[in-house]
Amino acid sequence: IIEPDKDSYRQSTMTKRSVKSIYLSKDEVIRFLQKDTSQYRILPLGSLANENRWSAFQIESIMGYHPAKIYRYNKLKDEVGWNSLGVLQMLNVKYIITTEELPHPAFDLVFTGKLFHQSKYQSTNVYQFKYAIPRAYFTQEVVVIPEMEIQFAMLSKQDFNPLASAIIEKEVGEVEYNPNAQVHISHWSPDKIEIEVSTPTDQFLVLSEIYYPEGWEITSHPDWKIHPVNTILRGLHIPAGAH
């Protein structure tokens, strides 16, 4: 019902043009976040959790609402949640957005300003995650665990460190971590990602993008396989050399 009868006690699904104009206009929090041109994601908490407005400004969020849910991601959210700092790291979370205070040693308050939410401006805090990691990184070791439930148990541990180990479902071959390896994302878009890597040894690269088996291929190396990592991310076995 788009425009219900006045006596029906239902609200109209239509939005006033003035509200839409403000919705699509930058507020103080949006402007602050856009100053950071690195690749990162945010975690909105509380009443902001289902907010989708961020996408209008190309700000990536690990929350939001969509009726069609990716099974692996939704399962992780329900089974593990966001209480593990390691999970926030692997999801490339850099900022926590909340209308409340967040007294936690892992997060620093870096900005307070107005955010347009639920048709009004609200004072909102932006906390920076001290231990945020890049969108793409080499992990020190790989651990083979086929069972999803056991993977969830490992991800739930407070000492889980995505830089130290990556959980995979099948063997990928020998890897030898070398801290001198380099990885750089030269292009990113929803349907194409270009990555430049240089490594003196065979290593395992984790890309903080959601794993989905269909529709993706490594165009420069069609024989390389994309592996599910930590249940929901993508991983590649990278041979020594520059690629």
Model regions and ranges:
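Generic recognition of flexible, low-complexity loop/linker segments
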Residues: 28-33, 82-88, 113-116, 181-184, ...
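Short, surface-exposed loop/turn motifs at beta-strand boundaries within globular domains
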Residues: 37, 52, 89-91, 120, ...
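Active-site regions of enzymes building and remodeling cell-envelope glycoconjugates
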Residues: 55-62, 105-124
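Active-site-proximal, structured, solvent-exposed surfaces of multi-pass membrane proteins
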Residues: 63, 161-243
